[in-house]
């Protein structure tokens, strides 16, 4: 696995060094247009050295902290402070929202939008600025075998067995909506021999058979790091393989279930890159406001990028209920924007970063859709060797 990591890191850095070497985001540095840019080695250390010269640095985030513009306090348990204005959610509504909710009830489908109390539910289901409604479908039931401290999905050691007809029913239901891009996710199913990977792969395959041109993002669990499970899903016909690391490396044990960890999640994303057909994107997401420090976020971004991940999203952690892990702070839009700038300079193909952004946020889906279509258009014009 170490050799695979080295290969991905080298390939990633080679593909991004050229396009970024002439750009700078340091407000205190003005480089002459005639000065030759420094050369950096094609390693993780080289990536860090280049970013120190060309991108927002930790001092930028520390400056935000010292000016009280990095985050806003949440108050105490007895005296909580009101949410900042940028965290106020819109009330769900609209004709499309009502139609989708009714359709989901008729088909007995579960969505992570509802189960996880996503703050963007109203925007995504009503169509938002794009006018196209989207929903993230959750398969393998509505009960998870794990108990992460941030998640609102109900848990059980022995959830009901999966519905064998679900792959067909879900595929037919989604195909009937006429969507261009859909996200399919699932709960963890540690109780199943294959962690639910076969059920997941079957759902994707059947949907792709019905709608060959539909772009499918699969937001999958870690399958306990099982290579065979990852391979099965990666080869199922999906367009985007997504798996969330959820938080920085240092907070994994206090935020996620004890069966999940940072290395295992990175391994899953690297395996997906290995097994999926060329052109398949990999994607991950982390929450901010869990108690992480800026330097931990930057270090996590470096490792994720060196693992070959194409897309990364950042959003504000929101406590689903008083039973869940408390929010440590509300990160400001300015700080989120700096993480986005840094991520693009690192070489991620797309970064969605904002207080209300979630891993399957609709604005990101449309951008990824256009990116995939552009890649395929270019690929189709290349001569066959």
UniProtKB/Swiss-Prot annotation:
Gene Ontology, cellular component aspect: mitochondrion
Major location (coarse): mitochondrion
GO molecular function: 4 iron, 4 sulfur cluster binding; lipoate synthase activity; metal ion binding
SMART domains: Elp3
Cofactor note: Binds 2 [4Fe-4S] clusters per subunit. One cluster is coordinated with 3 cysteines and an exchangeable S-adenosyl-L-methionine.
Subcellular localization: Mitochondrion
EC number, UniProt record: 2.8.1.8
Reaction(s) the record says it catalyses: [[Fe-S] cluster scaffold protein carrying a second [4Fe-4S](2+) cluster] + N(6)-octanoyl-L-lysyl-[protein] + 2 oxidized [2Fe-2S]-[ferredoxin] + 2 S-adenosyl-L-methionine + 4 H(+) = [[Fe-S] cluster scaffold protein] + N(6)-[(R)-dihydrolipoyl]-L-lysyl-[protein] + 4 Fe(3+) + 2 hydrogen sulfide + 2 5'-deoxyadenosine + 2 L-methionine + 2 reduced [2Fe-2S]-[ferredoxin]
Protein's pathway: Protein modification; protein lipoylation via endogenous pathway; protein N(6)-(lipoyl)lysine from octanoyl-[acyl-carrier-protein]: step 2/2
Annotated binding of [4Fe-4S] cluster 2, by residue: 144, 148, 151
Keywords recorded for this protein, A-Z: 4Fe-4S, Iron, Iron-sulfur, Metal-binding, Mitochondrion, S-adenosyl-L-methionine, Transferase
UniProt-annotated binding residues for [4Fe-4S] cluster 1: 113, 118, 124, 360
Ranges of residues in domain Radical SAM core: 129-349
InterPro entries associated with the record: Aldolase_TIM, Elp3/MiaA/NifB-like_rSAM, LIAS_N, Lipoyl_synth, Lipoyl_synth_mt, rSAM
Cofactors required: [4Fe-4S] cluster
Region named Disordered: 18-40
Gene Ontology BP annotations: lipoate biosynthetic process
Note: This protein may be expected to contain an N-terminal transit peptide but none has been predicted.
Protein family according to the UniProt entry: Belongs to the radical SAM superfamily. Lipoyl synthase family.
Name this polypeptide is given: Lipoyl synthase, mitochondrial
Organism, as annotated: Populus trichocarpa (Western balsam poplar)
